[in-house]
Every structure is written in C-alpha cells, then in structure tokens.
C-alpha cells in the first residue's frame, strides 16, 4: 500500500506544468550516446518506463541506469517486468509504482518484488492498470487529477494519497486519480528522426502520455530515419521531437523483451532466468547483473552475449507473427 504523504511534489501540477513549459521547443538534433543520455538521471529521481510488461521495454536505457549506479529511484510502469527486478536487486530502486509485476502469467507474481517489499527494502504503491494510465494522462494534460470509477470499493482506495470527489452533476462518488509527473521518462520506439520525432508500430501503450508528463525524456530507437520519412507518415509520430531531450540509436534496444514486428521476447531466456531465481533466490539476480549489466561495457557487447543466431531467431518469429 502507498504512503499518502509520499513525494507530494509528484502531484504538484502547477510546478510540473511550469517545468514542461520551460523546456526548449527547438528543432535541434537530439542524437547522443547512452552514457550521455542517462547522465541526466539523478539519484532520487522518479523514473517512468514506457512499454508494457515485456513489450518495448527500454532495456538499453535501464541497463545504462544500472551501470551509472543510481540510487533511491522510484520506478513507475503500468505492468513491470524483469527491468524492475534488476533495478531493485541492484539497490537502484527503493519504491515501485505499478499495477502488477511479473514476467507473465506462467511465472506468477514476481518473487523478487515479494522479497524486497517484505524485507522493507522497497516500498510498493499499487494502482489499478486503468488508474495508472489515467495518472499519466492527467500529467500529460497538465491537470491535477482525472475522475474515474476505478479502484472504488477496493482496498486500493487511498493508495498514494488518492482521494474521492463528488460528481457535481449526479452527486455520485468518484475516484480523483492524481496526475503523475515523472522526473524522467525512459522510452523505446521503432524509429525516430534526428530531431526526436518518434514513431511506434503496434500498440503505443502509455508512452505518449508519459513523454508529455515527464520533465526529462530519454528515448532509444531501433532505427534513425530521415525527417522526410517522419513527415511522410505524420500519423505515426506519437511522440513529438519537442518533448524529447535525448535520443539514442539502439538496435534490439528492448532485448530480451520484444519490440512489435521486429523481434519477439526471448522466452527461453526468461525460463533460464526464473529457474535460477527458483534455485538461488535474489542471489541469482545479482549474478545476472554481473554477467549482463556490469560485465559488457557497451550495448553491442551485451547483445553479443546472446549471439547473432538467437537474435535472428526472435526476429524471424516476429516476422512470422506479423505477416
């Protein structure tokens, strides 16, 4: 359950609007390196990750945050997956704001989350999936809250300081779902031009709202295309360049998670990872961090650990599923 007095600045819509309005809306180039992009993440920041569960997770950015040894972060994501487990096990995250945390139904609720929450090392603030989406939407709109029926009648009423309001038209009680204004957004997209105009294939999840609600927006892209390409299909540009602060080219930037149409999630890798946790508990995540995060110095070195054949197999699976 959430602490109603926890980080009230997250709900300060006037200050948050001021921060977003103060951002430079120039058409300058946003391309940079992973190291330079993640240097913008500070200890104590509230970091929101795009995608959903193991879909379009910004793994290259998460890995770089871990390599920067950031501390006392809050992580918010609609459905949290292995990226959350790695951040907790590394001591980077001390608070998680989510609707669910797992790799998927076959593996059940995260045992790593349970360990760190029950030990008191990590605070958990649980919202419904809809409520968390509304929080990002309210943040993107620059309003203090959005009314809804979600969570009413459940034990989640009051989580994170959520209050109820009376509908002025009918007198009915509504949930006043508070806006969420992250310090940093971590996002992964299919393609972007050098000015940060980002396109996403398939379901966009909550990324567009997160990008507009956050003070600082860091994006990795599978491909950098010309601005003529983004102008040719403007309807596909779900994140405008003026909200993006840093853009990094990162092929397979979600791996071992999926990126719709380009590569599938590596379920065999997930099975190996969870089997290790079943056998050795949180220590297995520490071993994983040493091998996949702290060991390989660059993103391409990380991908080399999986091998070209394994990456090609997941790309083939994605093509077969989206024919």
Each model region followed by its residue ranges:
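Conserved alpha/beta enzyme-core scaffold
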Residues: 1-323
């Amino acid at each position: 359950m959430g602490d109603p007095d926890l980080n009230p600045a997250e709900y300060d819509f006037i200050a948050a609007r001021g921060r977003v309005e103060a951002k430079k809306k120039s058409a300058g180039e946003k391309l940079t390196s992973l190291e330079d992009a993640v240097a913008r993440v500070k200890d104590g920041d509230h970091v929101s990750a795009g995608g959903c569960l193991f879909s379009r997770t910004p793994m290259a950015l998460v890995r770089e945050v871990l390599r920067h040894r950031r501390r006392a972060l809050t992580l918010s994501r609609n459905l949290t997956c292995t990226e959350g487990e790695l951040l907790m096990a590394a001591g980077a995250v001390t608070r998680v704001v989510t609707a669910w945390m797992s790799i998927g139904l076959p593996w059940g609720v995260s045992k790593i989350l349970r360990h760190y929450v029950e030990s008191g090392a990590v605070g958990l603030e649980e919202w419904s999936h809809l409520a968390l989406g509304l929080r990002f939407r309210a943040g993107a709109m620059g309003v203090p809250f959005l009314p809804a029926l979600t969570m009413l009648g459940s034990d989640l009423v009051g989580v994170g300081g959520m209050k109820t309001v009376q509908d002025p038209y009918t007198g009915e009680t509504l949930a006043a779902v508070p806006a969420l204004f992250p310090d940093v957004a971590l996002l992964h997209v299919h393609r972007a031009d050098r000015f940060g105009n980002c396109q996403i294939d398939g379901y966009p999840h909550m990324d567009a709202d997160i990008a507009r609600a956050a003070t600082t927006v860091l994006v990795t892209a599978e491909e950098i295309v010309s601005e003529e390409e983004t102008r040719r299909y403007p309807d596909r540009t779900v994140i405008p360049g003026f909200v993006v602060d840093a853009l990094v080219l990162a092929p397979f930037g979600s791996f071992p998670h999926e990126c719709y149409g380009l590569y599938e999630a590596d379920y065999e890798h997930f099975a190996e990872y969870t089997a290790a946790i079943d056998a050795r508990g949180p220590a297995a995540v520490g071993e994983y961090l040493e091998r996949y995060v702290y060991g390989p110095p660059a993103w391409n070195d990380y991908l080399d650990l999986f091998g070209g054949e394994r990456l090609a197999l997941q790309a083939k699976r994605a093509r077969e599923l989206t024919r």
